[in-house]
UniProtKB/Swiss-Prot annotation:
This is Large ribosomal subunit protein uL11. Part of the ribosomal stalk of the 50S ribosomal subunit. Interacts with L10 and the large rRNA to form the base of the stalk. L10 forms an elongated spine to which L12 dimers bind in a sequential fashion forming a multimeric L10(L12)X complex. The gene is rplK. CDD domains: Ribosomal_L11. It holds the Pfam family Ribosomal_L11_N. GO terms for cellular component: cytosolic large ribosomal subunit. It comes from the Bacteria. InterPro entries: Ribosomal_uL11, Ribosomal_uL11_bac-typ, Ribosomal_uL11_C, Ribosomal_uL11_C_sf, Ribosomal_uL11_N, Ribosomal_uL11_N_sf. Forms part of the ribosomal stalk which helps the ribosome interact with GTP-bound translation factors. SMART domains: RL11. One or more lysine residues are methylated. SUPFAM superfamilies: Ribosomal L11/L12e N-terminal domain, Ribosomal protein L11, C-terminal domain. Gene3D superfamilies: Ribosomal protein L11, C-terminal domain, Ribosomal protein L11/L12, N-terminal domain.
């Protein structure tokens, strides 16, 4: 039986498919960088344009093995939706919709890296990521309801921001008039019941 190699380091990195180059992220691993980049690029050449997560196992003798993973879910969703970035606030801004068939394709693609072998569970997981990015799934999400909720949340956020700005302005005006410091505490609606007790 062959002696098992001693692992000295395990690193998780990400490179564009077929485009890994020697650099600082690899230098710290103590492997022969050109050898890794050649093997990685050969193994990922057909996945052109994809970011490819990779786990590199480094052994004491400076040899290595690596394992490739599927592209990140966010990348696949943005690609399916035809957008460059997700929503900064998915509760108030919906940036795109995708079809249920696209969701299913992404779930099938991601299955090797998910901790489920059930397609429906995988789709549910991917749909959750999509919602967090401001992407809705036709035939899976209630799009009309989600858009209405987003409009309401955006209106509430704008109203709260305007109210807070007015409070800050009023506090600054009081300070200027009195030329002394004062502490201003904002009491939210849900806090009112607790203060009165």
């Amino acid at each position: 039986m062959a002696k098992k190699k001693e692992v000295v380091r395990v690193a998780k990195l990400q490179f564009n498919a077929g485009q890994a180059k020697p650099g600082p992220e690899l230098a710290g691993l103590g492997i022969v960088m050109p050898e890794f980049t050649k093997q990685f690029n050969d193994a990922t050449r057909e996945r052109s344009g994809e970011p490819v997560p990779v786990q590199i196992i480094v052994y004491k003798d400076k040899s290595f093995d690596f394992k490739l993973f599927t592209a990140p879910t966010s990348f696949m969703l943005k690609k399916a939706a035809g957008i460059k970035s997700g929503s900064a606030n998915s509760k108030t801004t919906i940036v795109a919709t995708i079809k249920k068939s696209q969701l299913e394709d992404i779930a099938k693609y991601k299955m090797p890296d998910l901790n489920t072998k059930n397609l429906e569970e995988a789709m549910h997981t991917i749909a959750g990521t999509a919602r967090n990015m401001g992407i809705l799934v036709e035939g899976y999400d209630d799009i009309v309801k989600a858009r209405e909720e987003a409009k309401l949340a955006a209106k509430e956020a704008a109203s709260a921001a305007a109210f807070e700005a007015k409070l800050e302005s009023d506090a600054a005006q009081l300070l200027a008039e009195n030329k002394q410091s004062a502490e201003v505490e904002v009491i939210k609606e849900k806090d009112k019941g607790n203060k009165d007790e």
